[in-house]
């Protein structure tokens, strides 16, 4: 499927997190910022989000991934990694694109924090209204 020394790069984004994913053929080892996935993301929900593109395309255990992730929190980072893995998988085989697209894994989730407006306490919270 893929030559020994070839690798595929995918950049994923979610909230303020940016993840650079380098996929190469291997046995399924995923290293995030120099640590194994189990050590970096302890909650199973985040790991499921990260591994979802591989589960959907049935490529689990066929690729090794080296991932660098910057910014954001745990949720943003796991979403960014999943987006990056999906983009890298798309480059490995064009046939996977339809599967990834139908599962919404190639679409960038553009939901970000809403900015604070002047005159309000937060994005939408107004100060208490006094009648008199």
From Swiss-Prot:
Record-linked NCBIfam families: PRK00132.1
Biased composition regions of type Basic residues, renumbered to the chain: 114-132
Any one Gene Ontology BP term: translation
SUPFAM superfamilies attached to this UniProt entry: Ribosomal protein S5 domain 2-like
Alphabetical keyword list: Ribonucleoprotein, Ribosomal protein
Protein name: Small ribosomal subunit protein uS9
GO function terms (MF aspect): RNA binding; structural constituent of ribosome
Family label: Belongs to the universal ribosomal protein uS9 family.
Source taxonomy: Bacteria, Bacillati, Chloroflexota, Dehalococcoidia, Dehalococcoidales
Tagged with keyword Ribonucleoprotein: yes
A GO CC term assigned to this protein in UniProt: cytosolic small ribosomal subunit
Keyword Cell membrane set for record: no
Pfam family, any one: Ribosomal_S9
PROSITE patterns xref list: RIBOSOMAL_S9
Organism: Dehalococcoides mccartyi (strain ATCC BAA-2100 / JCM 16839 / KCTC 5957 / BAV1)
Region listing for Disordered, in residue ranges: 100-132
